[in-house]
Amino acid sequence: MTLDDDLNRIAEQEKELSFDAFDLTTAWQLGKLLQELATERCLGVAIDVTLHSMPVFYAALPGVTPDNVNWVRRKRNMVFRYFRSSYASGLKLKKDGKTVEDNGLSGDDYAPHGGSFPINVKGTGCIGAVTVSGLPQRDDHNLVVEALALMLAKDLDTLRLAPL
């Protein structure tokens, strides 16, 4: 797959993986689903669900370090800045030959790497972010997409990014 293929697929994901409504209970269910998927697969990941600026769900599974906590924050900042997945933002920067610093942002606070995805509500837009850190960035992204697809009863096979 090319960069453009990935960017197009992620745009499709961001459109399809939108909720009719999303509240604190839904946020908890999403976080718990990610925690269950990661636990079943023995994945050492940090999981965060944040609505607006309020943390709603957080889990650190065996293997997570304080560094992952910082990655979660930095990836989530990308979603809150651009209202799109951190992976899409990173791929777009790569395509354009730019860095976050070229956009006046600090790499200490913004990580254009896969793993954070906007929580979109139809008719409203981005109200939060769901973030995973601990795997290679494409795998972090795909894990979040899988959980969202399961919650929304969407066909994961048509949404998942192909392996590199």
UniProtKB/Swiss-Prot annotation:
Pfam families: HbpS-like
NCBIfam families given in the database record: PRK02487.1-5 (NF002696)
Disulfide bridge positions per record: none
Family indicated by similarity: Belongs to the UPF0303 family.
Record's protein name: UPF0303 protein RHECIAT_CH0003058
Species of the source: Rhizobium etli (strain CIAT 652)
Gene3D superfamilies membership: Haem-degrading domain
Domain of life from the UniProt record: Bacteria
Entries under InterPro entries matching the protein: PduO/GlcC-like, PduO/GlcC-like_sf, YBR137W-like
